[in-house]
Amino acid sequence: MNPTNPFSGQQPSAFSASSSNVGTLPSKPPFRFGQPSLFGQNSTLSGKSSGFSQVSSFPASSGVSHSSSVQTLGFTQTSSVGPFSGLEHTSTFVATSGPSSSSVLGNTGFSFKSPTSVGAFPSTSAFGQEAGEIVNSGFGKTEFSFKPLENAVFKPILGAESEPEKTQSQIASGFFTFSHPISSAPGGLAPFSFPQVTSSSATTSNFTFSKPVSSNNSLSAFTPALSNQNVEEEKRGPKSIFGSSNNSFSSFPVSSAVLGEPFQASKAGVRQGCEEAVSQVEPLPSLMKGLKRKEDQDRSPRRHGHEPAEDSDPLSRGDHPPDKRPVRLNRPRGGTLFGRTIQDVFKSNKEVGRLGNKEAKKETGFVESAESDHMAIPGGNQSVLAPSRIPGVNKEEETESREKKEDSLRGTPARQSNRSESTDSLGGLSPSEVTAIQCKNIPDYLNDRTILENHFGKIAKVQRIFTRRSKKLAVVHFFDHASAALARKKGKSLHKDMAIFWHRKKISPNKKPFSLKEKKPGDGEVSPSTEDAPFQHSPLGKAAGRTGASSLLNKSSPVKKPSLLKAHQFEGDSFDSASEGSEGLGPCVLSLSTLIGTVAETSKEKYRLLDQRDRIMRQARVKRTDLDKARTFVGTCLDMCPEKERYMRETRSQLSVFEVVPGTDQVDHAAAVKEYSRSSADQEEPLPHELRPLPVLSRTMDYLVTQIMDQKEGSLRDWYDFVWNRTRGIRKDITQQHLCDPLTVSLIEKCTRFHIHCAHFMCEEPMSSFDAKINNENMTKCLQSLKEMYQDLRNKGVFCASEAEFQGYNVLLSLNKGDILREVQQFHPAVRNSSEVKFAVQAFAALNSNNFVRFFKLVQSASYLNACLLHCYFSQIRKDALRALNFAYTVSTQRSTIFPLDGVVRMLLFRDCEEATDFLTCHGLTVSDGCVELNRSAFLEPEGLSKTRKSVFITRKLTVSVGEIVNGGPLPPVPRHTPVCSFNSQNKYIGESLAAELPVSTQRPGSDTVGGGRGEECGVEPDAPLSSLPQSLPAPAPSPVPLPPVLALTPSVAPSLFQLSVQPEPPPPEPVPMYSDEDLAQVVDELIQEALQRDCEEVGSAGAAYAAAALGVSNAAMEDLLTAATTGILRHIAAEEVSKERERREQERQRAEEERLKQERELVLSELSQGLAVELMERVMMEFVRETCSQELKNAVETDQRVRVARCCEDVCAHLVDLFLVEEIFQTAKETLQELQCFCKYLQRWREAVTARKKLRRQMRAFPAAPCCVDVSDRLRALAPSAECPIAEENLARGLLDLGHAGRLGISCTRLRRLRNKTAHQMKVQHFYQQLLSDVAWASLDLPSLVAEHLPGRQEHVFWKLVLVLPDVEEQSPESCGRILANWLKVKFMGDEGSVDDTSSDAGGIQTLSLFNSLSSKGDQMISVNVCIKVAHGALSDGAIDAVETQKDLLGASGLMLLLPPKMKSEDMAEEDVYWLSALLQLKQLLQAKPFQPALPLVVLVPSPGGDAVEKEVEDGLMLQDLVSAKLISDYTVTEIPDTINDLQGSTKVLQAVQWLVSHCPHSLDLCCQTLIQYVEDGIGHEFSGRFFHDRRERRLGGLASQEPGAIIELFNSVLQFLASVVSSEQLCDLSWPVTEFAEAGGSRLLPHLHWNAPEHLAWLKQAVLGFQLPQMDLPPLGAPWLPVCSMVVQYASQIPSSRQTQPVLQSQVENLLHRTYCRWKSKSPSPVHGAGPSVMEIPWDDLIALCINHKLRDWTPPRLPVTSEALSEDGQICVYFFKNDLKKYDVPLSWEQARLQTQKELQLREGRLAIKPFHPSANNFPIPLLHMHRNWKRSTECAQEGRIPSTEDLMRGASAEELLAQCLSSSLLLEKEENKRFEDQLQQWLSEDSGAFTDLTSLPLYLPQTLVSLSHTIEPVMKTSVTTSPQSDMMREQLQLSEATGTCLGERLKHLERLIRSSREEEVASELHLSALLDMVDI
């Protein structure tokens, strides 16, 4: 098999499949016109194109050969192709089954060295096993050597073809091939040798044949020799193959006999073979292979009833058997077919010779005109092959179209010539046989098959319809002539402009027409119409006259275009790839070099040129058949889309909206991205410049991520199709180049993320926009590729950072697969243990166990992409969950249960109730009134899973852009790249990217010259013919557009094609033409149209002359007007130029500044890069050190392990020896002990026997045989006569009894009594001790004292709330340890006086255990302690959690105490996990139910007998460290308590735990409480009043007008906005305060109400505070009249009051203020004008704003009632709570700063000073510009005494530099003296008077320190001070008053004096700093 063959399933035989549909007239073309043509069908050729309209492609079973569209070909001595062009077919006799030579067209240069016996034929037919192989022959430079034969006379028939309509894929009627592949040359073609014969005839050719000679087992091919022809015939490119306009070669079938046989055949045999070859054709079975995805496949003529012809199955003859047997052998085996073909050629040449002479003479008149439309070949010959005719094309159509082209070239009246030529060529076709009509001028909206079929179907039965919208025409075929005539008569009613003509298939008079069944019903058109060739022309004909070398693309070029059929790739026996490459390099380099400089103006021309370049390069490529030498493709494309594809898709209008220039349909080369092309069997191997390397792929993906991913404003369908298609293209390039590295992995990962995102984002889109199944398939392919790449990289030692993420995605995508866990176990340990894979495994467990609660919780906690994958299972899990709920909540099938719909929405994570209702209804359940009726019998399972909707919970997770999601992180920078262009600014091809792609040639092609009869006229004689291209090159890729011939002809091409050997015979007489009435009517119509056109041209010429005369008269008037207007325009232009010059200078300055900034930036970047380099070096060093350390550690561990193993071995051996010894010793001791025990046992038995005998003997001796009959008191004496009687008391006390002779007996009666009494006493003591101990152990804790003692800090009121978290002990027995501990812990925190009955909470929620409210002392301070204890049993239900959040049970909690249940010893890990998970669930429920801030401390009580690892086990089981890191708890401690309550150890532990909780409780909140009115007033007074009144006083004392009202109002509103933001801060919402149990409605200073920080309440407070704002007011114009200004002021004041009742109050105040202003102004103006009044600057705007503010504060009412009723206190006030520190963050608005700065500037100008100490008021002081008042007072006094003093500016205006310097020094000295004097006076006053803070007001500094601001009564005298009064008298009076009121000691005076001095210094420093800051601001 051939590894490079795209059809690897084919054997290397010539034509191994019978399904290849190749013939003259295949009845069903397998593709629509404009699509890629499968080889073997007629490729449609546009009449406007000079190249191919399709590139034929064929399936794997096809055995056809490909023909390349190269125009220049030089055959080496091994070439065995004979160049022939037939009338209807171009067939080549190929004698080899190896890879057939790609037929090329160009200068006719051949070099045949080896002699061979070849017959020359006018028709070049290819021999093959079947009619499935074509090798189009191209003409090169011919040098033939023929041995003359006397009877071999051939006359080429070239006059019947019309070049614009001829296609380049011409199929011979007979095909033969020979099975045995030859190895005579790399091309595999047999050599030829022709004797060269020269003839002066231009129309006939004599050929001589010699017996063929076999060379290297190759059969000879037949190649004709043609004599040189004159220059005139050569230049008629569109008409002639060999230079004649009418001569054409027809193709004939050739017998499969051996070539060496004599050529004997009859005419009948030739004709029969021709007809058989034509008729035996069938369409290809695989029609649509290789078609583009977006191309329309419905317009194929195959859908319109084309009748298939029979298959052609010619015999195959050769020296060796065929490589593969043909599939069908149904053709009758005829004999001497080769001879019949020769005879038919003889006769055909004789018949058409005369017609060729006539046409040759006729075309001599317009040779010069035709040359302008031909290819411009510098010094070369233009007699090259014209495009071949497609089989089945009508000769009449060819002639008519050809004549139209000739007329256009002549520039003469062409229509008459066209008609004459058309009618002359009708031949034997009768008008009654025409069954088709042609409709012209059809509008686009009517030019549709459906509309036309409906229209003509009403008239007659339509067979088929072909449309061409670009030409506004359509061809309609009927079944008979009568139907066509009726349709032609009545069909014009469709549209008024439509014209209908007969559509006839014209047949050449020199050929017998084939029957309709034998003809292919389509011509070579690009459009769907197959029979409208005569009406189409080349689009490149216009550009041909403009371009020189670029005229290669001209349709009317005389170059014979090669066939569209591709040269099929065969595998020869053996050939050297190096020699092949060297031989094929010469013509490739020359061909590519000739393309340089070719002009291609349009995108279509550029595409054709680039396509021709690619085809040449494909032919020059070395085809490797050895797998060992196979190499991986390496892409070299630098653009996101290859250049050829950009032009191709622009030509075909296949551009996306993201790739075009906005507003046009032109391609945006910078935005075009390579389109995905589906792989097919007929595709060529890609060239390097068609593949993008990895950096370009990465840049392409970056472009898609940054520029496309987030552009979803338009159609989602276009967006998804574009991104999906382009990412598939990236993946295909990766696959073709076999890329595998981390960057490649990242590209595939981004593709995967895109598909995961679309799986959820596009799930609601219709099937036409998004197919989830296809998306999942692509996602699966991406994940599979990633899996393989991860494995390959891991084998190389490379680990990918995102492997765990995508392995997790793979698991999530396969949750329904049963063996997914087995695949997970095969992951790398690091991947398997990652959080992503663990999450996927958890999802698998939840889905397969139908744990829908767990599943949806995982969805809520998952990342966005994980959630998108889990979204695919929503329908499945919801269906299973609904089934489980329906079964669980219903008793039987007869009874239904009502279930709340909200619960379903919450549990199954629906978007809303509507979506849940739809889902439930789909499953047969009824929903009504917010509830669903669960019923087992009504439950239905719909077929399949319903289409899920987008989930809002997943959408919320998309917190970043889609690009960042797909990129997996922040977006990369936007890629910048300039696309590569192979054309310069003059649209000339420069070929920049070709050098790197051509193979290096080591062999120069041989040169051979041929003399010709036209060398003098056509140019320089050629020196070296172009060698043949390698014939084993891969077939070109299918292309649905015409492929332009791009190889330019070189000057070295021979001027002639063939040299005719004998003078031709005279041509036969022309046939008599036949005309019909319809033809005459058509001619008349055309004559009328031509006459009308000439008349219109005359009228237009007269009108143009008149217009020219009128323009001449108007020019004089125009000159006068221009002269008058020029002066004004010049002035305006001069002014504009001046302004532009200024702007230019400003821009230069800005550029200089930008350059400076750029340099600084570069410096910073260099420093940063150095820093990064150092950091990177350190990081690398750290990594190497870490690796070294890890290696050393590993070695040390291994060494230590070996040592340990050795030591363990020794220990084990010693231990075993010890065990053996112990066992032996034990056995010995055991035996000895057994013996001793045996001895002792028998000895003891002996002793017992002896004792028993003694006792029996004593009893028998002492005890009577019967009881004695004596009194009880005498029985002792009777029994023991010798005993003591009575018993002595002393002996009895001693416990002795004297029995006389029997001895003394000791008794213990009293001792037993004493022992019993003692024991009973001790038992009583122990009982009471245990009872007391139990009472103490069960006693309640003194919580108030504990809290007061251990609470950090000092507080007067303490609120402490503890939550006990107890296990669920309801199901345990009363005697169980866990229940006892829970009850005991509740008793410890209950207390007698503090216990309460919590009836508000049910048993499943949180209960209030106790409340304490008492006074406790801490040191000498009494503290009010309020303690609340809450208790929670077990895990809370959802309803209980909702109740907790609603009732705010956990609000204000200060600590948590968790009691774990006693742990049962068990080895089952599942039970242990359940134990810890239940405790963790209970704890997390409470932590999540409480407010987020603050985090609480946690105490964990563990009942255990004791252990070392208890604390570690608790930390791991409850994940306490994670809770701390998540800020759910602040700290924790684990306390072990005994599991039984029998001592005080448990109480001590609990006491310590409470102390720890109190000491670690959250700090109390620093909240301030004020009423709303008080808060607003204090805030305004603190931030607004000081600034406002100071500014007002400063301006008044400085004699300035009032401040602008806009700045004052903006300052006031800014303060209110600040106050509103403080009181409604978002951080208040998360505070867990107050304690719910102690809070009161309306709130208090200690505790706010429960809803104080609710978002609704805070929003209401913000709105209420903002309700104090004033509306904006702009200052009226300075010259505004008084009355309108007053009206405006009154109207503004009317907006302030909140009610109509208070509006008159403010209105009267405003009117009073205006009246006083008017009176003051009137007093200054003795005789005011009527209606006049104060100016705008004289109106006291500050007083007006002050009145409005005061009224607003007094008259304010809330906009509406508070949201909650608890916000109102008992007295109707609303308390607000805020942080005190937040009030210190106010920033003064910029407008007020500017207003203050303007005030300072105005004061400076007014006082005539250059600089004064500026004022910068702080936030909480009221500085007053008294220094200014003092200076103004002094200046006013001096001016009153001395008159006006000139200002400083007046004095310095005319001074010199020395005078200015002296003036500056003098002024500086005066300032210093004045400052010194002021300080001395102030100090003297401080020392002399005891005024302290009540010193001289005029001497106060401008900048008051903080220490003096508190003396607010210093403002009062200033408020009353008038400018006209004496400051000294006021000062003395105030000082006396203060002196009388102050009676302080001397020490206090000194301290106060020191404080004043310090404050003065601070004020000076602050003043200087502020002044410098203001000066800097001014400079900026």
Curated annotation (Swiss-Prot):
Lineage: Eukaryota, Metazoa, Chordata, Craniata, Vertebrata
Asymmetric dimethylarginine PTM positions: R32
Protein family according to the UniProt entry: Belongs to the SAC3 family.
Ranges where the record places region CID: 1162-1256
Organism name: Homo sapiens
Alphabetical keyword list: Acetylation, Acyltransferase, Chromosome, Coiled coil, Cytoplasm, Immunity, Intellectual disability, Methylation, mRNA transport, Neuropathy, Nuclear pore complex, Nucleus, Phosphoprotein, Protein transport, Transferase, Translocation, Transport
Effect the entry attributes to changing R878H: In PNRIID; uncertain significance
Leader sequence residues: none
GO molecular function: chromatin binding; histone acetyltransferase activity; histone binding; histone H3 acetyltransferase activity; nucleic acid binding
GO cellular component, one term: transcription export complex 2
Pfam families in UniProt: CID_GANP (PF16766), MCM3AP_GANP (PF16769), NupH_GANP (PF16768), SAC3_GANP (PF03399)
Region called Disordered, residue ranges: 1-67, 212-247, 266-432, 511-557, 998-1038
Protein's name according to its UniProt entry: Germinal-center associated nuclear protein
Residues where N6-acetyllysine is found: K489, K490
Expression (tissue specificity): Widely expressed. Up-regulated in germinal center B-cells in tonsils (at protein level).
Biased composition (Polar residues): 1-24, 212-230, 414-425
A GO BP entry: mRNA export from nucleus
